[in-house]
Amino acid sequence: MAGAIIENMSTKKLCIVGGILLVFQIVAFLVGGLIAPAPTTAVPYTAIKCVDVRKNHHKTRWLAPWGPNKCDKIRDIEEAIPREIEANDIVFSVHIPLPSMEMSPWFQFMLFILQLDIAFKLNNQIRENAEISMDVSLGYRDDMFSEWTEMAHERVPRKLKCTFTSPKTPEHEGRYYNCDVLPFMEIGSVAHKYYLLNIRLPVNEKKKINVGIGEIKDIRLVGIHQNGGFTKVWFAMKTFLTPSIFIIMVWYWRRITMMSRPPVLLEKVIFALGISMTFINIPVEWFSIGFDWTWMLLFGDIRQGIFYAMLLSFWIIFCGEHMMDQHERNHIAGYWKQVGPIAVGSFCLFIFDMCERGVQLTNPFYSIWTTDVGTELAMAFIIVAGICLCLYFLFLCFMVFQVFRNISGKQSSLPAMSKVRRLHYEGLIFRFKFLMLITLACAAMTVIFFIVSQVSEGHWKWGGVTVQVSSAFFTGIYGMWNLYVFALMFLYAPSHKNYGEDQSNGDLGVHSGEELQLTTTITHVDGPTEIYKLTRKEAQE
């Protein structure tokens, strides 16, 4: 009688497989920690105040802070008064990147946040619920002498959230407000060498545009992009892991189709998990080096969402298939209460992502958080997804508890068995618990390394060796889930190892009433397999 490989594998072989996977896991962490640089780099920019004295500002004129055709600059706002320069004539210009540097497609994306330096003036204070309106133009070029090409031009509103900690008296004039940073721009590809931002703050007192926003002294930006070195390591990992998971997936399904029965639910779910892992592994990002694909960030979010939804569904079905009655198991409809929250939560996060990054495909300055309605809508989606996640977690904890309780109850039958049979099923129970604990360990490691990467300084030093913690987190966790899926497809593939006829009627099969099972893999056409019978509840219980 054949079962899953995990049922027929000796403890020694299981430990060897576990040791090999552990070695690959350590290598995955070391690749990120020792070879790859930090995942991202943050570059501060201070906008240069250029002067555009044309009477008509409707036609875009690019004002560069430096270079062959640099603009006429002023150092501060006070310098504009004697020169009779109006607020509408001042253009805040930012050249990306800094002098003597170039952007690269290996940077993958650009994210910018905005910081305003606003001075307190008694006659020009920030009013309540103040909103700044910026006229922003984004241009690009690929050499230092060609003309700028417009990439985007939008009116960008942002709500100011500023506090002034000192008393609002004349002696405190000139001190700066404490203002929250504002989301400014996100681009899903870096296809050009140079970018130019021109930010205008048009003032219209009749329409109350940019009135009551205080005296803006400077505009500062922080640009965040992925490091090219990390991108190359990341692409190399995806290129290596894609065929690895694909080959084991084909091998797994081939062994299932060789059986004389149709696949059971757990086998189908494991195969679907392998497909979702392969989908997230396929290194389509290589094409972003040669093509201006701004949708890659959104596509990456969708791929991750599909994988995690499949992973969460697998955990539920894996537990359920080891605790349900015979007629309830092997049907996805029996899990609608548990899988339903996963579907609802995933759909909410998908809609939220489409409302944010989907719109950014045409307007890189858009942010759903900049308006009250957008903020409430985003929070609603996130809260619903959070509630679904909590419900899922409660369902999962309850099902895991039920599985272990059923196993503990059935273990009382083991002493009455023959020694060979008892040792066989004790091994099955051990392997089932082992796999459950490995699942818990993977989830715990994901959370722990995420927290460590957030609270650490980004890297640790031991003598002359520098370990990039954040990079190790990304490569290690990514490698870990690949190894997890690999192990599932390998251990739960049907085994071609059969027990002899004498054993079937002897030590391993003395009485039909003693027949016990740990997995839901059906070993022959007529009956269920070994782990299932051990863990399923009897209908009368």
Swiss-Prot record:
The chain crosses the membrane at residues 16-36, 233-253, 269-289, 304-324, 332-352, 381-401, 432-452, 472-492. It is found in: Golgi apparatus membrane; Cytoplasmic vesicle membrane; Cell membrane; Endoplasmic reticulum membrane. Changing Y392C: Knockin mice have several structural anomalies recapitulating the major defects observed in patients with Zaki syndrome. GO terms for biological process: anterior/posterior axis specification; cementum mineralization; exocrine pancreas development; hindbrain development; intracellular protein transport; mesoderm formation; midbrain development; positive regulation of canonical Wnt signaling pathway. Changing Y478C: Knockin mice have several structural anomalies recapitulating the major defects observed in patients with Zaki syndrome. This is Protein wntless homolog. GO terms for molecular function: mu-type opioid receptor binding; Wnt-protein binding. Regulates Wnt proteins sorting and secretion in a feedback regulatory mechanism. This reciprocal interaction plays a key role in the regulation of expression, subcellular location, binding and organelle-specific association of Wnt proteins. Also plays an important role in establishment of the anterior-posterior body axis formation during development. Induction: Up-regulated by WNT1. Transcriptionally activated by beta-catenin and by LEF/TCF-dependent transcription. N-glycosylated. Pfam families: WLS-like_TM, WLS_GOLD. Its main location: Golgi. Expressed in the brain, skeletal muscle, heart muscle, lung, gut, liver, and kidney (at protein level). In the brain, expressed in the cortex, striatum, hippocampus and to a lesser extent in the cerebellum (at protein level). Expressed in kidney, lung, skin, intestine, brain, spinal cord, skeleton, eyes, excretion glands, tooth and palatal shelves. In the cerebellum, expressed in Purkinje cells. The gene is Wls. It is a multi-pass membrane protein. Residues 101-232 are annotated as: Interaction with Wnt proteins. Disruption phenotype: Mice display embryonic lethality before 10.5 dpc. Embryos show defects in the establishment of the body axis and in the primitive streak and mesoderm formation. Interacts with WNT3A. Interacts with WNT1, WNT3 and WNT5. Residues 1-15, 254-268, 325-331, 402-431, 493-541 are cytoplasmic. Belongs to the wntless family. GO terms for cellular component: cytoplasmic vesicle; cytosol; dendrite cytoplasm; dendrite membrane; early endosome membrane; endoplasmic reticulum; endoplasmic reticulum membrane; Golgi apparatus. Residues 37-232, 290-303, 353-380, 453-471 are lumenal.
